[in-house]
Swiss-Prot record:
<dbReference type="GO" id="GO:0034353">
    <property type="term" value="F:mRNA 5'-diphosphatase activity"/>
</dbReference>
<dbReference type="InterPro" id="IPR039039">
    <property type="entry name" value="RAI1-like_fam"/>
</dbReference>
<dbReference type="GO" id="GO:0000166">
    <property type="term" value="F:nucleotide binding"/>
</dbReference>
<dbReference type="GO" id="GO:0071028">
    <property type="term" value="P:nuclear mRNA surveillance"/>
</dbReference>
<keyword id="KW-0540">Nuclease</keyword>
<feature type="binding site">
    <location>
        <position position="260"/>
    </location>
    <ligand>
        <name>substrate</name>
    </ligand>
</feature>
<dbReference type="GO" id="GO:0110152">
    <property type="term" value="F:RNA NAD+-cap (NAD+-forming) hydrolase activity"/>
</dbReference>
<feature type="binding site">
    <location>
        <position position="273"/>
    </location>
    <ligand>
        <name>a divalent metal cation</name>
    </ligand>
</feature>
<keyword id="KW-0963">Cytoplasm</keyword>
<keyword id="KW-0479">Metal-binding</keyword>
<feature type="binding site">
    <location>
        <position position="262"/>
    </location>
    <ligand>
        <name>a divalent metal cation</name>
    </ligand>
</feature>
<dbReference type="Pfam" id="PF08652">
    <property type="entry name" value="RAI1"/>
</dbReference>
<dbReference type="GO" id="GO:0005634">
    <property type="term" value="C:nucleus"/>
</dbReference>
<keyword id="KW-0694">RNA-binding</keyword>
<keyword id="KW-0378">Hydrolase</keyword>
<keyword id="KW-0269">Exonuclease</keyword>
<feature type="binding site">
    <location>
        <position position="274"/>
    </location>
    <ligand>
        <name>a divalent metal cation</name>
    </ligand>
</feature>
Length: 403
C-alpha cells in the first residue's frame, strides 16, 4: 500500500461545457516571477480552473494514452529485480474476486472468512519497510533506461514515483508545504525525487503518534487478509510489485511513473488498490481529502480500481468490503449535494485538481528548463507552500542522472 487553503470567491464559468484548454496556462501579468540567478519565486495562487461548484457526470482522466510499459518485482532481502514476470503479481484471493464481480456484499462465504477480523492483530510484531526503500530510485532509473528510446524527444517527460505526483496534485487541498528535488537531464527530461532535508516520518513510520501508526497498520493487515498467501518459490514476504506507466499530460509533457501495486484481480486483469477506512462522512474534511487522494492515485493508472475494507472505528474489526471504480469515487466527492455547500480547499473538486495538475506541470517544465544547464544534469529544490507559491532554487543534495 502506497503511503502521504483557500476559501475565496470563485468566478463562475460562463458555460459548463467550456473547453478546459482555455483555462490551462495563466497569462496574467500580475503573476510575474521574482527571479535571482538560478532561482525563481512565482505565485500560483490564481491558477486557472473551473468553478469549485463545477459538476460533470463523467470523471476526467488525468493522463491520456496511458499504458503499462513494464512491471517489476523487487525482492528486498537480496535486492533482486525481476522484470516483466506476470506470474509474480500479488493476486487477490479467488473468493474476493468473485465477491467483487457479483457485487453480493452479503455473500456468506466472504462474511464468514473476513468480516469481524481485528485489523490491529499483529501490530506489535510488525516491522515496516525502511523509508529509503519506498523512495528508492533504483527501479525507476532502470525502467527509464529500458524505455528511454521510445520516449518522444519533442516532449519533456517527468520521471517519478507515483506518490510524488500525487503530492504535487494535492497541494491546493492541503494546509502543509511540499518540498521535492527535480533534476533536469541533458535530454530535457526531469526526474522527481524525495527532498531528504524535508522528508518527515509519517503514517506507519511516524514515531510520536502510536495511534496513527496502528491505524495505518490496518491497511497492511487488510492486504495480508485479502491477497493469496505466499507459496514457496513464488511471492516472498518482503517482495514489492511495481507497475511502470507512461502517459501524456498534454502536447508538451509526458509522465513515466513507478507505482507500487497492492494486488491484481485475476478475473478482470485489473490492479486493485486495497484501502482500510472507517465509514466515510462526506462532511468531514479529512474524509473528503482522503477520497480525492484515492481518486488521483487510481486515475494515474490505465486499469485500476479500489477495494475498501470499512472497519469499526472503536474495535477496528472489519465490518464491510466494498469495491469502487474510479467513477464511483469521483461521484462521491463531485455531486451537486456536496459542492453546493460552503467549503475550503476548493471543495476538494477533482476537476479543479485536474486543472491544477495541468497548470503546475506546465509551469514547472517551462521554468526548470529555463534555469537548467544545457550540457549537464541540474538538480533544483522545488517547494510549494500553503499559498501555492512556487520556489525553485539550486539544490545542495546531489541526485545521480537517469542515464
Amino acid at each position: 500500500m502506497t503511503t502521504v487553503s483557500c476559501d475565496k470567491d470563485e468566478n463562475k464559468v460562463d458555460q459548463l461545457g467550456e473547453s478546459l484548454s482555455q483555462l490551462r496556462i495563466s497569462t496574467r501579468k500580475n503573476n510575474k516571477p521574482s527571479q535571482k540567478k538560478g532561482s525563481l519565486v512565482l505565485s500560483c495562487k490564481k491558477f486557472p480552473h473551473v468553478s469549485v461548484n463545477y459538476v460533470v457526470d463523467k470523471t476526467p482522466k488525468l493522463l491520456t494514452d496511458c499504458k503499462e510499459v513494464h512491471n517489476c518485482s523487487y525482492i528486498i532481502n537480496d535486492a533482486t529485480l525481476l522484470w516483466n514476470e506476470a506470474s509474480r503479481k500479488p493476486r487477490l484471493r479467488p473468493e474476493v474476486c468473485t465477491y467483487i464481480k457479483d457485487s453480493k456484499w452479503e455473500n456468506k462465504a466472504v462474511k464468514d472468512s473476513f468480516i469481524g477480523i481485528d485489523l490491529t492483530k499483529g501490530y506489535d510484531d510488525y516491522v515496516p519497510l525502511d523509508r529509503n526503500v519506498l523512495n528508492s530510485l533504483v527501479i525507476l532509473k532502470e525502467a527509464y533506461q529500458r524505455y528511454e528510446k521510445t520516449l518522444n524527444p519533442e516532449k519533456t517527460t517527468f520521471v517519478s514515483l507515483r506518490h510524488h505526483i500525487i503530492d504535487i496534485i494535492m497541494c491546493p487541498f492541503l494546509d502543509e508545504p511540499l518540498s521535492l528535488l527535480m533534476t533536469v537531464q541533458p535530454d530535457k527530461n526531469i526526474l522527481i525525487s524525495v527532498d531528504k532535508s524535508k522528508d518527515k516520518p509519517n503514517g506507519i513510520h511516524e514515531t510520536r503518534n502510536s495511534f496513527n501508526k496502528k491505524i495505518c497498520y490496518t491497511g497492511f493487515a487488510l492486504e495480508d487478509l485479502l491477497i493469496e498467501s505466499p507459496t514457496e518459490g513464488h511471492i516472498l514476504e518482503h517482495e514489492l510489485y511495481y507497475s511502470i506507466v507512461h502517459g501524456s499530460l498534454n502536447d508538451e509533457i509526458d509522465l513515466l511513473i513507478q507505482a507500487e501495486m497492492d494486488s491484481i484481480n485475476t478475473l478482470t486483469d485489473t490492479y486493485t488498490e486495497i484501502k482500510s477506512s472507517v465509514h466515510f462522512k462526506l462532511g468531514n474534511t479529512y474524509h473528503r481529502r482522503k477520497l480525492l487522494r484515492m481518486w488521483i492515485q487510481t486515475n494515474l493508472l490505465p486499469k485500476s480500481d479500489l477495494l475498501i475494507g470499512f472497519r469499526n472505528s472503536y474495535s477496528n474489526e472489519l465490518e464491510q468490503l466494498k469495491a469502487y471504480k474510479i467513477q464511483d469515487i469521483y461521484h462521491k466527492i463531485n455531486n451537486s449535494s456536496i459542492v453546493g455547500k460552503p467549503g475550503k480547499f476548493y471543495k476538494f473538486n477533482p476537476n479543479v485538481a485536474n486543472d491544477w495538475f495541468q497548470h503546475i506541470f506546465q509551469v514547472l517544465k517551462q521554468n526548470l528548463l529555463l534555469l537548467s544547464q544545457e550540457s549537464t544534469s541540474t538538480t533544483f529544490k522545488v517547494q510549494i507552500d500553503t499559498n501555492l507559491t512556487l520556489s525553485i532554487s539550486p539544490a545542495s543534495q546531489f541526485v545521480t542522472a537517469l542515464g
